[in-house]
């Protein structure tokens, strides 16, 4: 099994299913590697330059498929995700494209099903299964790769009620994230599991901007 490939980025292309592929030339051999959309955008600006891509290979009846990542941590998290029943390679890539590594690990560890379900193809039941099967593993895994914790936030139930209420009131997701980040700096409020109090404080804060 390959650990990584080092070569020249020749091209980035997107197929009819919307999946991104990197053509990486290594010693006169062009490898076609599926990569997350975020990484594809970065690589598109670096065509013709040497690249170090961490890979996961998957053998199927119709051939060998390669999936590429910018770091060993991203590749390892991909492997953790596809170990869960019902999460295939495309679901794992969708999760990695929707959330940053720290955000994704945090969402799983804290069982934030709403955050996980933002990824295309990931429903509530799949999000619950992810948290159930991986939360203890990823708590230790995060320390191994020295991934930072995301900023402190209200618990998942409060977060969901708060976000849904503010969305219903017409606020944008960027405004909501900013308000939650600001309110989460209050250590006393963080200990409060009353969603109504969070909502009241958030509306007050947003009305001042």
From Swiss-Prot:
Q: Where in the cell is it found?
A: Cytoplasm
What protein am I looking at?
Holliday junction branch migration complex subunit RuvA
Q: Which UniProt keywords apply?
A: Cytoplasm, DNA damage, DNA recombination, DNA repair, DNA-binding
As for family, the record states: Belongs to the RuvA family.
A Gene Ontology biological process term: DNA repair
The record's Gene Ontology cellular component field reads: cytoplasm; Holliday junction helicase complex; Holliday junction resolvase complex
Q: How does it assemble?
A: Homotetramer. Forms an RuvA(8)-RuvB(12)-Holliday junction (HJ) complex. HJ DNA is sandwiched between 2 RuvA tetramers; dsDNA enters through RuvA and exits via RuvB. An RuvB hexamer assembles on each DNA strand where it exits the tetramer. Each RuvB hexamer is contacted by two RuvA subunits (via domain III) on 2 adjacent RuvB subunits; this complex drives branch migration. In the full resolvosome a probable DNA-RuvA(4)-RuvB(12)-RuvC(2) complex forms which resolves the HJ.
From which source organism is this entry? Picosynechococcus sp. (strain ATCC 27264 / PCC 7002 / PR-6)
């Amino acid at each position: 099994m390959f650990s990584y490939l080092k070569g020249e980025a020749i091209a980035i292309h997107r197929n009819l299913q919307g999946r991104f592929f990197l053509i990486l030339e290594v010693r006169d051999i062009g490898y076609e590697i599926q990569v997350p959309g975020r990484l594809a955008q970065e690589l598109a600006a670096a065509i013709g330059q040497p690249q170090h891509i961490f890979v996961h290979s998957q053998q199927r009846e119709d051939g060998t498929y390669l999936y590429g990542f910018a770091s060993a941590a991203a590749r390892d998290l991909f492997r953790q995700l596809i170990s869960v029943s019902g999460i295939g390679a495309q679901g794992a890539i969708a999760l990695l494209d929707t959330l940053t590594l720290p955000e994704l690990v945090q969402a799983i560890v804290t069982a934030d099903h709403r955050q996980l379900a933002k990824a295309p193809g990931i429903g509530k039941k799949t999000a619950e299964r992810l948290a159930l099967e991986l939360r203890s593993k990823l708590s230790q895994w995060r320390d191994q790769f020295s991934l930072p914790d995301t900023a402190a936030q209200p618990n998942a139930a409060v977060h969901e009620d708060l976000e849904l209420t503010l969305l219903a009131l017409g606020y944008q997701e960027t405004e909501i994230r900013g308000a939650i980040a600001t309110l989460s700096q209050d250590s006393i409020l963080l200990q409060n599991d009353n969603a109504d109090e969070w909502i009241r404080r958030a509306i007050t804060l947003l009305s001042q901007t």
